[in-house]
């Protein structure tokens, strides 16, 4: 089934990242293309759950990055936000400033205690609020490894009962738009 294949691909992807077998595939990419892809995928899910999803791109630069991996980061963070938010809102904000892409996913979901925040990036780590949810507990561990592979950082701010905010920052060079267009 599709679900089984997706779970196997998740496991294989995790082990490849964990063993340093993955390398970034860099190419010019417009930041708005990333946010548009994520918005297109997650807007229907948010609407089905009765959640408000806000997507905002502050600076639309063309950068040299691994577009698929940045989308995977956003995908995993938004997927978790959808999973652990029963009512309220979720936001995705991207910005490019001073050579750094900043991607922020914030939700009004269940939030986490300090102790849970210490464990949440661990492989196969499933918090008590995830007991009835699908998955291996690898999503955030995969995100952390992709962010590290791309030379970035991830930060979590959360409070039990008040939601979570994940901030990813990755250095990446801006690309001249003429150069980017001639390569496409």
Predicted regions and their residues:
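Short conserved segment of the HATPase_c
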Residues: 112-124
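Short alpha-helical Gxxx[C/S/T] motif in the catalytic ATP-binding
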Residues: 139, 143
């Amino acid at each position: 089934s599709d679900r089984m294949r997706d779970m196997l691909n998740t496991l294989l992807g995790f082990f490849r990242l964990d063993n340093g077998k993955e390398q970034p595939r860099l190419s010019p990419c417009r930041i708005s293309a990333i946010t548009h892809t994520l918005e297109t995928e997650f807007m229907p899910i948010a609407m089905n759950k009765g959640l408000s999803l806000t997507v905002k791109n502050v600076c639309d630069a063309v950068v040299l990055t691994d577009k698929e991996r940045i989308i995977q980061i956003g995908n995993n963070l938004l997927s978790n936000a959808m999973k652990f938010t029963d009512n309220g809102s979720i936001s995705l904000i991207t910005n490019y400033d001073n050579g750094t892409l900043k991607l922020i996913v914030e939700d009004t979901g269940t939030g986490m205690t300090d102790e849970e925040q210490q464990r949440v990036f661990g492989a196969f780590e499933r918090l008590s609020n995830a007991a009835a949810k699908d998955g291996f507990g690898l999503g955030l561990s995969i995100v952390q490894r992709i962010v590290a592979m791309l030379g970035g950082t991830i930060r979590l701010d959360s409070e039990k009962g008040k939601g979570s905010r994940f901030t990813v920052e990755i250095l990446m060079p801006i690309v001249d738009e003429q150069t980017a267009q001639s390569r496409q």
